Amino acid sequence: SRHLNEYMGLDFEMAYIDSMYDVMAMETGMLKSVMNYVKEHCPEELALLKADVPEIKEIPTIRFHEAKKIMEEKYGHKSKNRYDLNPDEEVLLCQWAKEEYGSEFVFVTHFPSAKRPFYAMDDKDDPKLALSFDLLFRGLEITTGGQRIHDYQEQMDKLAARKMNAELFESFTMLHKYGMPPHG
């Protein structure tokens, strides 16, 4: 179930955000709505599949480096990947969220910028970290999101820092040049 060659997905973009936390709040609200709808309108299908729909109250949030520290201190797991979460770490983090918060979901934020796409905004307080997140559920990453760069010069600087040819992204960066609102 980890990698599928075909799947259906849902992407959404939000403009005029203050931070990535606005995107996370919207995602949490959408998940609550979808789960409630499925519970109310699909009981026969749920019974047929022997599936349970999780209860979503609040979704705990943990920073990437804090998550790595907890996995080592609480579970004795020494990570070999300093830029991302391995599958076993995703399972452990979901176990931690269930034990500590009674939640089957957990947001992991502030991944190393080097791991995130060129359009992910870096944290002004620590530019080595991106203002981005993954949402984990029952041991699997189910979404990725974050705040995107909206400033033209900031986007051009990040492309240059990553030694990417800005000309190849001209149609993308043109939007920034003429005015892009804060978005995620």
Model feature map: region roles:
Residues 141-149, 180-184:
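Conserved phosphate/anionic-ligand binding catalytic regions in large, soluble enzymes, centered on
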Residues 1-17, 174-180:
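Class II aminoacyl-tRNA synthetase-like tRNA-binding/catalytic domains
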Residues 23-27, 63, 151:
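Hydrophobic (often cysteine-bearing) scaffold residues that line and stabilize catalytic clefts
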Residues 29-138, 161-181:
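Metal-assisted phosphate- and nucleotidyl-transfer catalytic regions
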Residues 11-22, 139-141:
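A generic structural motif
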Residues 19-22, 26, 35:
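Glycine-rich, acidic/polar active-site loops that bind/position phosphate-bearing ligands
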Residues 1, 21, 116-119, 144:
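Short helix/loop capping segments that flank catalytic or ligand/cofactor-binding pockets
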